[in-house]
Amino acid sequence: LSGIIANTLEVTGESEGKSVARQFDAIWESSLTDSASKGHPDIEVVTFDSRLHSINEILAVTDKPMIVDGDTGGDANAFEYTVSKLERAGVSAVIIEDKVFPKRNSLEAGVQQNLQEPEVFAQKIRRGKSIQKSSEFMIIARIESLIAGKPMEDALNRATQYLQAGVDGIMIHSKSKNPDEIIEFAKKYQVILNDLNLKKPLVCVPTTYNKITEDELSAAGFNIVIYANHLLRSAYQAMMETAKTL
């Protein structure tokens, strides 16, 4: 249902005094949403083959590009399998996070988030890139340093190593209620790209710092904005309220 909604929704607004119609550019296949829909916590207990079944069902009802939440990607061998299967299914990109398996949801309170060593994660990226057939399929690294309470320098060092490993883009994650730290990262990320003579997209997920606009994020240097799990969150609340009236 989310795939159908994202595929067909069109919102009319104004831009520079002119009426414009806007649509979603792509679909985010969320691990949290997929797990919750099956009654499981978001801790990588849902098997990849089960996730793949959901992915194929969504792709059957949409022609939008799909970005898949790949959790940690497992070990390098498992990630090769993931990349191969997702590419064959028609997925456009996979995002994997640099936590150790099994991961815990980044917004879960009171949980210690353990990160994988950047050298190990970089090797996983290399293995994934080596197995893909098409140059169009993207592997994006999700940096969890700020989620884990690490300093900005840790996030930037990880970004540098992952870019040198051949990753196609970087996602910086934060659970802060204001966007200051991700904007700081974005500015310093551009310096890294210039030093490496690269052009790689930057991704964010403004779930907690949701007052900032797309235009402001774009001006800060972000290329992709993911609105994660919003349809599930609103559907859950609506179903709870309806259930109370039955």
Regions found by a protein language model. Name each.
Residues L1-N223, Y227, S234:
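Alpha/beta enzyme core
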